[in-house]
Amino acid sequence: MVSAMWDTSALKLRNIFEEEFGGYLEKRLRESIQLNRPTKRYLKLATRSDIDLKFHKVGKKESNGSSLVKYIIEFDTTAILVKGYIRPWNNPEWKCKAPYNSNQNVDTRSLYKEKIIVRDNVKDLFSAALTKLDLSVRLNKFDQNVHAKYRLNEDFLQPLGRTLRHSCEFPVMHSRLVQRESELYEEFLSYDLPKRQMTTMDIQFKTVKVQSFQQYKIQYIQTLTREKTSQEYTSSARLPHWQSNQIQNSSIKFLKLCCEDEDFHPLELYKLENPKADQFQRKAVYRSKPIKPKWRISDEIIKRLNWNPFKELNLPKNSELLESLRDVQVRCTSYALVFKRIPSSKIDLMVSKIPVSFRSVNAISYDQFDPKSKENVQESSQCIDSLANEETTDVDEVTNKRIMTSGKRSFINADLVSIIAAKRSKLKRLSISNGDVNPVATLNETVEQSTMSNVTFQLSDKSFHNAEEKVIIFNAEYIAKNYKLINFLHQNNFCVLEMDLGDHSDILLDASTCLILRNITSVYQKQVDSFPLLRAIQELKCKYKRVVIFLSYSERSLALDSNLAYKTQLLLNCLGGTTTHLVEETQLKLTATWISLYCGTNTPNEQQIYRMSLSKEVLQHFDINPIAIESILSLTSLEEFLSISYGKRALLYGKFLTEYQLAHIDDFVTMSWSE
């Protein structure tokens, strides 16, 4: 709204004009008036001129012909500006007792009681005016020099009756209560859980806070209309209770029971018995005899019917028609119980400082070993020499050296002791035939030695010859802990990447293998009722098919407990499916060698791993590692990967994905969308 204000600071008006023109002179009113160009030009000329401007009152029916006057009359205003001089009328002056000083400041708000001496002709004028009851005097008839107290107020005998001409209608405010009552809250909750859901998950439903109106009834129940009385009623509304007297007909009850019988015949429904007269409690109506039963068929048919139609009927029962019994020979076969074999972890033997080369001893069953069997010694020795000199990436074929003193075998059970004893005899025969160092003799010689032997390994410089082709991904969360190993791998030209894997693993070796680097003392750290390291390994087994654990130790820890390494191995064997290696803390080259042996050469490069796409983001939600994602997308597309069946997906991509990941993907694909 555009507002303007009349500037009347240059005008010298009396207080009487302030009462007549309201708030125009006090600058209290703001109006927006649309004027045409001639009127704007005329108003601008009138305000900038030096002439005296005067206000005069214009009635609704009067019009001076000016465009400004005509315009303001249309908008129902009470004052206009007129350019020009107005000649004052020569009105008779009132004579007062004391001379009036025009320079004296007189308060017009005070009331004066004075007597006015008038002549006889003036009295006649007043008497004639009183008969007409109209003493209205125009303001412009009097001179400005005449004081206001001698003037007669305009229309003082008639009520003005001023009302607001331009009323503003404000919109009615919307009731907040009515608006909230009209809103409906609809919620849908699924009644089933996803497949293969973990039972240990705590499911909590958040309550939806809806503002309730305790003093108002949303669903109002209309009661019966009552006459208006002065009695006060409670606000509780009760539903009317209609009492119904059910007629107990014995014949109908009998027919209902007969319908449940399998031998019931439909002809019984043709004959119905009317209720007795005493069951109807009517006023002044009594029946002496009950109503005779009537057939619901015509009389002609009744004559031809046999009155005892059920006497000669020999209908079979429903059970005889629908069911038949025969002897069937059933042979119950008992199925053999098959227990799933849990793969155990490997047992690593600690070796002495003397370099000894033989294969790592794996956990095998006692039934598979025959101590009386004889093998060709020459072929076995050649096989061991070839394994020691051949370069391979399979960790089971890598040669290493271990030592195991008698004090550190105290926890091993009887079956495992017999297996190790047979293995010793076999290695003894091999060492005698080849003339090499006998590991059993070495073990027997070190029984009386100190148990604080250093763990040494025979390393090969050929382990790093393909370092440029191997990509090792470190977890960005544990970079501060593994910075020494990262620097060592950088110096040997390995491609080292850093990514946030979102799990407890330290290194991602390939598409299905992860590596954990921990101290041996962290295995026995306990929180509340669980071991943090064991819980982390269980979580990693859901994401990776193979979990490799490197436990670093120091000579001081072995000096405190000689059986610490084997106790740790026994505890980790309970998990199953893990491979544990004991490495000395200072052996960075040894750790790098094992990491190089576990890494494959067909891993994607740095650009392929860091390049993100929509398909990779979808597969990341199923807890799949980056190398496995690249391997899957290199073989097929995302649409084809999700559209195939569960068995085909497990057959084609089972080497990258675990059973938990396959089940998670299958739950997502077979999910039902409810409205």
Curated annotation (Swiss-Prot):
CC terms in the record's Gene Ontology section: chromosome; nucleus
Entry superkingdom: Eukaryota
UniProt GO BP: chromosome segregation; meiotic cell cycle
Main location: nucleus
Subcellular location: Nucleus; Chromosome
The keyword DNA-binding is annotated on this UniProt entry: yes
UniProt keyword list: Cell cycle, Chromosomal rearrangement, Chromosome, Chromosome partition, DNA-binding, Meiosis, Nucleotide-binding, Nucleus
Coiled coil: none
Nucleus is among the record's keywords: yes
Molecular function GO labels: DNA binding; nucleotide binding
Entry similarity comment: Belongs to the ZIP2 family.
Function field: Required for initiation of meiotic chromosome synapsis. Involved in synaptonemal complex formation, a structure that tethers a pair of homologous chromosomes along their lengths and plays a central role in recombination and homolog segregation during meiosis.
Protein name, per record: Protein ZIP2
